[in-house]
Amino acid sequence: MAFKSIFSLFSSDLAIDLGTANTLVYAKGRGIVVSEPSIVAINRVTNAVEAVGRDAKDMLGRTPGNIVAIRPMKDGVIANFEVTEKMLQHFIRQAHNGKTWVRPRVVIGIPSEITQVERRAVEDSLYRAKASEVYMVEEAMAAAIGAGLPITEPHGNMVVDVGGGTTDIAVISLSSIVCSRVVRVAGNEMDEAIIQYIKRKYNLLIGERTAEAIKIELGSAYPLDEPLSFEVRGRNLIEGIPKTITITDEEVREALADSVSTIINAVRVALERTPPELSADIVERGIVLTGGGALLKNLDKRLSIETGLPVSLADDPLASVVLGTGKMLSDFNLLKRVKWENTITSGMF
């Protein structure tokens, strides 16, 4: 109880959604204070950080030879420990308006099925980034809380969190994840599918930023009411010169077909593993979509058709995970109920 009262006094406490595509930071009492791409630009010669977040993303595919733009997260886990540490230091400092002496307590969301080694890598990165204590919760649980689902009740709630690196699916009841499924197919995989499709069909090479723009403008999981098209500029692989083509929503849907099918099949697997009583609840309550990938046009409609269940989009799908972890900053009992005690919290750097 004493710890609970102490925890509530710290205004420097932070909640973090450390995503493959984007990192969001929620500061207690202030709301979301950082929402930036998970990208760092590093000078190869000096190893110095040139830019982080949005500024670094603007450099993707446009950097000189001595600067490289790095995504330190891959498939929901840390791929580059050193760069992740630098990125977290930057975002934590940004959340505290440049103050370097603050050592916040941090609640962070992690994919449901990552290994102990991967969990430890996240924890170590945060301690090295000057966190005083680290508490981990599954991203699907955090997303459900952020979406306003009644996770403490004895009823089944199903959430599908489509992020940048992973799609995290969970059925939740009584503050616990009853069954879950994680597939390493999400927004970034869709971008890569678009790059490969255009390369294969048009002999045109495009970059990550262009692929993401195509996905946002034209991407869909089910036919649209009105056809859409988009001008794409890239480099012709045969002639080696810049070229412009026009691509349609139907073509992009074809490019994304495998990724969408993988997500839908994972949802089916999770439903098959769900106990009958909780399945009955899901029939009534439906499935809630969260995460940036959930914004893919008509994904909710396609999933509803494929499963026969009602599917809805969270009010703020991009921020659901960080809003959920943010709620735990003010409610230690909630943090305790979602099994934070299973997380290693010792060690400090």
Label each PLM-derived region with a short phrase.
Residues 1-162, 170-287, 294-349:
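Nucleotide/phosphate-binding catalytic cleft detector across ATP-hydrolyzing
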